[in-house]
Amino acid sequence: MNGFFLPRRMGRTALLRYAALLDGQTVNLHAELPAFVTEAETAEIVLRRGLRRHRRPARVYPDLEGPWLMDAAVLLGAEAGGVPVRRGRWKLSLEVRSGRRSVRLPLTLTEPTTPRKGATGPMARSPLTAQRYRLGRTVRGDARVVCTRIRPAAEVAAVHVQHARIDVDLRVLGVRATAPWAEVVAAERRVRCPLAEVQPGVWRLEVPLSEMVPAGGGREHWDVMVHPGRGAPLRLARRLHDVQAPRRVFTMRKILVSPRRGVLMRIEPRYTAAGNFRFACADGDRAE
C-alpha cells in the first residue's frame, strides 16, 4: 500500500530523511519540507491519538541549496519529563507557522532508519520505566510512535562489591512493588532475603554469603528472584542498556570471603548471555 500512496503524496508532506529511537525514549527526527514552504518562524511536532494532542518544539531552517529542513528530538514518557504518551499508536505531524499563517504537514516515513553498528546500539525500552516505544508508519506512510504494554521486570541498578560483602541495588518496573522481597536460588536451595528501600523505587539486597557456600566443596550458580508483592516473581537482570557486548563491558571483580569460620569461598557476580544476574560460587581453597 505504501507504494501506491507515497508517490501521490510527495510534494505535500515533510519527508523524513532520518527517524530513530536510539535511547529507548527519545524520537530523533530530520525531515525535508515540501517546496511550497518558503518561510517559517516556528514549528512544532504534534503527536495525535484520537482527540488527544501533544506538542513539542522543532527547529526549521533553510537549506542553502534546497528546501527547508527540520530537526527535532522528542522525549517520551511522563516519568522522564517527556510527552505523556500512553499505550496505543500516536501519529506524528509537523505544524509550521509564519506570522498568522500555519500549515500542518504529515511526516512521511519511506524507509526506517538503520542504526550504525558499534559498541552501542539502539535501546528497545526506556531505561527509566522499561516502557517499549517503536517507530512505525501507517499504510499511507505517515510516521507514528507505537507505545506498548510495559513488561514487568527486575533491573539491576548497581552492584557494590566490598572486601567481604556484596550489596545489589535493584528496581522493580512495570508492576507496583508493595512489599518486595528476594530469593537467591541454586539448583536445590533457596534463601529468602529482605529488601530495604534506599531511594524511592530503589531496593537493596544484602547478599547472604554465609548461606551460599557450595555443597560438597564444588561450584554453584545462584540466580536472584524478586517477588514484588503481587504477581509472579521476576528474575533479576540487566537489560535496559545500549551496550552491544554487556558480558565484556559489565564485568565485576570476584572476591575471596570467609562467610563461616574456617571456610573460604570465591564469589563472582556476573551476567549471563541473556542478561540475567548470577553469582558463581566456588570453594576458595580449590578455585583459581
Q: Where are the regions a protein language model picked out?
A:
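Basic, ligand-binding patches in group-transfer machinery
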Residues: 1-288
